[in-house]
Amino acid sequence: MDALDLIREAKKGDREALIKLIMDKKEEYYRLAFAFMGNKEDSLDALQDMIVILFANIKKLRDPESFYSWSKKILVNTCKNTLRKRKRVLSIGIDKEEEYIENYQSKELKHDIMTYLKRLNIHQQEAIILRYFMDMDYETISRLTDIPEGTVKSRIFNGLAKLKRIIGGEYQ
C-alpha cells in the first residue's frame, strides 16, 4: 500500500494506517522535534502529541499529497506551544548521547555553535536551524513556519550576519 492509500485509510479512521505513515518518516520527525526541544524525552513527547492531533484532525486534510508537510507543520507548532507553555527560550540543543559524539573537539564545536545561535532572536534561530541543521529549502521552511519565503531568507541572512559579527568580535 502506498502513502496515498494509507492517507485515504487514515482519513477513514484507520489508526494503523496513520501510524504506518508516521513510522515511514520517523527519523525526519524525530530530528525536527529534537531541533526544537533539545532532548530525547521532550522530542518523543512532541511526537506523541503530534500523533494525537493528526488522528483528531486527519479528516480535515484536503490534499492527501500534502500530508507530510501538514504533519510536520503540526509537529513544529506542537513544539513551539510546548516551549511557550514552559516559558522557556527556544532551546536548540545538541545531541548529548555519547553515540553521536565522535570526539571532544566535535562536542566542543557543537556546543560553541549552539551557544552562538542562542544569542540570535528566536525567529533567526528557527530559520537557521531548519535551513542548515535540518537541510530544508526556503520554500519548505516557509510552509512549515507559515511565513513568506522572503521573510525566511531575510531571517537567515540577518541571523548569519549577526553570527558573523558575534564570532568576529570574540576572535579579534
Give residue spans per PLM region.
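Helix-turn-helix DNA-binding module
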Residues: 41, 115-126, 134-151, 162-165
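Arg/Lys-rich amphipathic alpha helix in sigma70-family domain 2
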Residues: 59-62, 73-92, 158
